[in-house]
Amino acid sequence: MSVLEIKSADQCRHDLVALGEVMLRLDPGEGRVRTARLFSAWEGGGEYNVARGLRRCFGLRTAVVSAFADNEVGRLVEDFILQGGVAVDYLQWRDYDGIGRTVRN
């Protein structure tokens, strides 16, 4: 039987590593999605929100584990994650088939 070893913080690269989906949210502002022609874009997702919040509020070293289509939308979400101060060391990139049958953001 193996023994669980808990390392000290100075021996770890990250204080928290979140595993989950990161989504792109399109916000129409005051109008309705159906009639809007301009949107603000935001990143979000339960696990990612925790990682970003701990980074912003407490300065913890956080990272996210997720997978994205290797296209402009996926790279946009990656940029948002980096702007939030969360490490992207563990992101996985998947080939995009052009229509979202095999992978999508």
Model-identified regions with their sequence ranges:
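Conserved donor sugar-nucleotide recognition element shared by glycan-biosynthetic enzymes
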Residues: 43-50, 73
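Positively charged, low-complexity intrinsically disordered leader regions
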Residues: 1-34
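Short secondary-structure capping/turn segments at boundaries of alpha-helices and beta-strands
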Residues: 5-6, 50-52, 92
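Alpha-helix C-terminal capping segments
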Residues: 42, 51-61
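Short pre-catalytic strand/loop immediately N-terminal to key active-site residues, enriched for Gly-Thr
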Residues: 35-44
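Conserved N-terminal subdomain of the carbohydrate kinase-like
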Residues: 61-105
